[in-house]
Regions:
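Short glycine-/Asp-/Thr-/Trp-enriched loop segments that recur within the blades
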Residues: 29-36, 79-82, 125-138
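Short loop/turn segments that connect beta-strands within beta-propeller blades
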Residues: 15-17, 62-66, 110-114, 167-171
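Blade-loop segments of beta-propeller domains
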Residues: 19-54, 74-79
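Conserved beta-strand positions in repeat-built beta-propeller and related beta-rich domains
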Residues: 2-5, 14, 50-54, 97-101, ...
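Beta-propeller fold detector
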Residues: 20-27, 69-78, 116-125, 130, ...
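Structural signature of eukaryotic scaffold interfaces centered on beta-propeller domains
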Residues: 1, 39-43, 85-91, 136-149
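Asp-box/WD-like beta-propeller blade repeats and closely related beta-sheet repeat scaffolds
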Residues: 55-104, 124-125
Length: 181
């Protein structure tokens, strides 16, 4: 991922030789272009999902080392209720997307971009008024990762205030607080 690019947000390389295959995810305002690139996730060895928060969409790209090409296979437009989605994890049945309004901790979103359900709340040891939840959600922006083998979603706030472990298979949630949590 290239955030300081002039033309393309993504560059694919061979491994372990690191030979350039293709640049893709053209920067721009056109229908086939991207306004931004917040994150990406490998879908398979030759396919990635990429999030464009400004267009509120996730694109799936197929990459061919043989043809030196990247083709947009799918565009998933996110529902307007998913305001400013900045991260995601794909599971076998849905996307998991943090809620940056602070009403919930994250959303389960179907592969059409529609919310299925919201889960959890912002971890804090104090009961905070609802009017400050959006600010807290932005301040506690989390890094997220999902392990498809055991159904574990881990969320860690950027400054380490909390670590959350959601077991999506057993429907359990554990929160560990840091010194400023």
């Amino acid at each position: 991922m290239d955030l300081q690019n002039a033309d393309n947000y993504f560059h694919a390389f061979t491994y372990p030789n690191w030979k350039h295959i293709v640049s893709f995810g053209k920067r721009g305002e056109g229908p086939e272009e991207m306004l931004s690139a917040e994150t990406f996730q490998f879908n398979s060895l030759d396919s990635i999902y990429a999030l464009d928060a400004n267009k509120m969409q996730i694109s799936r790209w197929a990459i061919s080392a043989k043809d030196h090409s990247a083709t947009r296979q799918e565009v998933i437009r996110l529902d307007k209720n998913l305001i400013r989605s900045l991260d995601f994890c794909a599971t076998d049945s849905c996307f998991l997307i943090p809620d940056y309004l602070g009403e919930h901790r994250y959303w389960q979103v179907d592969y059409s971009g529609k919310p299925i359900r919201s889960i959890g709340k912002i971890p804090t040891e104090k009961d905070l008024a609802s009017e400050i939840r959006p600010a807290l959600a932005q301040a506690w922006r989390s890094f997220i990762d999902y392990n498809p083998h055991n159904g574990i979603l881990a969320m860690v706030t950027q400054l380490g205030e909390s670590i959350e472990i959601y077991n999506t298979k057993e429907n359990t949630h554990t929160v560990l607080y840091g010194p400023n949590g």
